[in-house]
């Protein structure tokens, strides 16, 4: 995006914010389309197996996790508008390249590069979105911005499966190429305030080499614990639903989950901005905790969907709250590194959940996973938040 010297006042739904939210949505939608469609492509057209299909996700995760902290440093040190343009251009080129990939090795290379671009593109969009928002509406705005990720999570797999099933994998790649071209346009069509896009002044000392924002670590780690529990939900729900004879309800589960987030997001963000984090975080922890207990006890479609609604309300309150706290913990010139630190924590947490919680499910069952372990993680996060909140209050009193 180009520069503009005038800001947009206290308005929330500016063209800049809408464009950045759309950029985030299409990045995440492409990822979820590929998560659903690439395994079918590899196994049916390239005659690979489950291992080869899984490697496509592994290479993407390697690129994302390895690049995320560097992305934050780049965003703070370089011209943010030009960096966003470069990332969205790379996004378009990579989606186009998928149309011409004919071997597993070519797909793996593209997925690795896609992971790197995804880390830069989503971190840049999230950082700029936080900076264009008025401070008085940051909680509400980041909540709506995060909603673009939630919607992509629901829409992406459905679109991917439908395209592959009815039109083939080439149609899926063509669709992603067109989406990426639209992203390139909408991300860069509007001008941004010059003070937002210009690089921060060079720092002295060790902080200029930091790849993690220490001030944002508490909120990032708390968000990581929430996403660790969410990762267990996201990864193993198809298997859990199958064990209950509810495999046909998985898509509807995520639809209910997303709809509840959509319905509650406006007033949750408003409460955060007007009354503070505690008024959304504590109810969010309670709802997320109860939601997992309901999920573990569900045996019918009605109970299954009720658990989805409660989990959606809890997750919808917690996720944007910790992202807002992470960004608010630093000066604007370090927002990129703070955002990258937050997302890096989420990347690692979801990946670690997929790698470890499967062992719990295999040895102790899904009732233990969802009824004991995930609620325990939520309790640990709650206790950590309470301790950190008390420490913050003490610092304010002694200041």
What is each PLM-predicted segment?
Residues 105-113, 302-310:
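Paired small-residue
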Residues 15-54, 230-240:
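Helix-loop boundary and gating motifs at the non-cytosolic
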Residues 67-79, 265-276:
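Helix-to-loop junctions at the C-terminal end of transmembrane segments
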Residues 112-148:
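Cytoplasmic helix-loop-helix junction between adjacent transmembrane helices
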Residues 2-14, 192-222:
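Juxtamembrane intracellular "pre-TM" segments in multi-pass secondary transporters
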Residues 177-197, 383-388:
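C-terminal membrane-cytosol helix-exit motif in multi-pass small-molecule transporters
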Residues 82-96, 279-293:
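Structural signature of the two symmetry-related core transmembrane helices
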Residues 61-69, 153-154, 258-266, 351:
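Residue-level signature of mid-helix packing/kink "hotspots" within the transmembrane helices
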């Amino acid at each position: 995006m180009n520069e503009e010297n005038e800001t947009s006042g206290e308005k929330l739904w500016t063209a800049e914010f809408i464009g950045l939210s759309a950029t985030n949505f299409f990045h995440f939608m492409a990822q979820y389309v590929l998560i659903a469609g690439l395994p079918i492509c590899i196994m049916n057209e390239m005659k690979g197996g489950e291992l080869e299909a899984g490697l496509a996700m592994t290479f993407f995760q390697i690129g994302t996790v390895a690049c995320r902290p560097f992305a934050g440093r780049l965003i703070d040190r370089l011209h943010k508008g030009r960096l966003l343009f470069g990332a969205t251009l790379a996004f378009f080129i990579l989606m186009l390249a998928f149309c011409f990939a004919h071997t597993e090795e070519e797909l793996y290379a593209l997925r690795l590069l896609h992971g790197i671009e995804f880390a830069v593109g989503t971190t840049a969009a999230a950082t700029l979105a936080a900076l264009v928002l008025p401070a008085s509406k940051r909680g509400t705005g980041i909540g709506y911005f995060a909603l673009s990720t939630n919607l992509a999570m629901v829409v992406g797999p459905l679109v991917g499966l439908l395209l592959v099933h009815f039109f083939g994998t080439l149609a899926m790649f063509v669709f992603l190429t067109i989406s990426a071209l639209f992203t390139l346009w909408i991300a860069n069509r509007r001008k941004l305030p010059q003070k937002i896009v210009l690089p921060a002044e060079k720092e002295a000392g060790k902080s200029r080499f930091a790849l993690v924002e220490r001030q944002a670590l508490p909120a990032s780690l708390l968000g990581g614990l929430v996403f660790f529990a969410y990762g267990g939900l996201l990864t193993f729900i198809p298997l859990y639903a199958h064990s209950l004879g509810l495999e046909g309800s998985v898509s509807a589960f995520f639809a209910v989950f997303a709809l509840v987030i959509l319905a509650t997001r406006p007033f949750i963000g408003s409460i955060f901005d007007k009354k503070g984090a505690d008024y959304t975080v504590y109810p969010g922890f309670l709802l997320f905790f109860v939601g997992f207990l309901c999920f573990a006890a569900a045996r019918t479609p009605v109970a299954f969907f009720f658990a989805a609604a409660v989990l959606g309300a809890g997750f919808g309150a917690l996720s944007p709250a910790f992202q807002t706290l992470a960004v608010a913990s630093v000066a604007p010139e370090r927002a990129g590194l703070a955002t990258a630190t937050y997302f890096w924590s989420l990347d690692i947490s979801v990946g670690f959940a997929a790698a470890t919680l499967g062992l719990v499910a295999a040895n102790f069952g899904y009732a233990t996973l969802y009824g004991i372990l995930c609620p325990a993680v939520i309790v640990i996060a709650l206790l950590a938040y309470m301790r950190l909140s008390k420490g913050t209050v003490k610092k304010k009193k002694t200041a």
